Amino acid sequence: MSSDSRSLDHDTIAAIATPSGRGGVSIIRVSGPEALSIAELLTQKTLQARQPLLTRFFAEDNGVIDTGLTLFFQSPASFTGEDVAEFHCHGGVMVTNLLLEACLALGARLARPGEFSERAFLNNKMDLTQAEGLADLIDAPTQQAARQASASLQGAFSDAVNQLNQRIIDLRVYVEAAIDFPEEEVDFLSEGRVAASLLELKAALTTLISQARRGALLSRGAQIVMTGAPNAGKSSLMNQLANQAVAIVTDIPGTTRDVIKQTISIEGVAIQLSDTAGIRAATDAIEQEGIERAQAAVDTADIIIEVVDDREPKETVLYSSDNAQPLIRVLNKVDLSGRAPGVLNATDQEDESVPPSVAVSAVTGEGIQALEQVIIQCLGMGEAGTTSPFSARERHVTCLKRAEAALDEASDRFEVSQAGELLAEDLRRVHAELG
């Protein structure tokens, strides 16, 4: 059964389309085969598609609920692809609920969360990636995330995947043509076009994965955990990055017992910053619990910031992580140590293989801007906050990586065997992974 015919079996749904609470305007949306009849009964007017009309809204007892704007969108030229009616009333909580109840009394049922978008998907008004882009746009934590979610809603991500998929199909057709003409197959496959095309596809897929990773990061926000010895200045650093007093700062080691979280934005990237308990031999059960929570936070972080007192730079932090997250070493308290603030040059570091180090003062703010730039670079955003042209989800990254693995396998096998049949089958698998 096609998605279009499936949608015709749906009943008519209604819901409040605007946030709850008081406001200037509230919108009730109705979608389904009875949308027009409900709208005309509610307004006691004859409605024309795409012609806004100022109407009164009537209750079951024929009393007037409110006066507002009514719009009707005829299938398939609507958000859901079905007949849709919208009622724009004054934004009081009670009047909005009364208008919704009137719609339900006339035969609509209350929509499930996300059901309007679901119907739009089932009616081919948007694909799944666009539907997810819509959700990301609604939940966007920053301006940059909103821009990218809007791009995905307009089809930017879908177009990028579809274009890559078409190139894979074109190459497979070329290879299958060589198989159909066996006397020319060797010439077809050995002339270098196939090998060059495989390299180009691998490069394009690598770029797409990188963009999707950054898009996913912007959609969900980055998790950054600060760890270090007690009194290294983690709480002061958190307050400096958040530009407000989030964590309690004292000279007493072990003041922070629980994980303190604060959402900040650096160059349009939403970041949940976590200040954790200082790592040391615990003096009591409460401190031990704080240290264990710190370790749990480290294990799920996108970036770990190790904060050390620059007056004791040899001090090491005793934590472990099974993940390969980027690590940034922050040498704090340069206002006391005398070191120049900023990113350390390779010659300033004892070992070039160690993570990037940034000298800062969490008290004066010196070096904080340099630290923010290092954070952006470690998140893969590149210079000056370069980011993805679309939003994405972790599942998208996973699917793209599976396609990349299949393409790598196809390329390696072809390099060894030069067998067109195997390559065509491998390309079919890559195509399937991309969907």
Residue ranges and their predicted role:
Residues 56-74, 254-282, 300-303:
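Switch I (G2) and immediately adjacent beta-strands of P-loop GTPase domains
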Residues 2-20, 143-266, 282-284, 311-435:
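C-terminal-of-GTPase-core extension/linker across diverse P-loop GTPases
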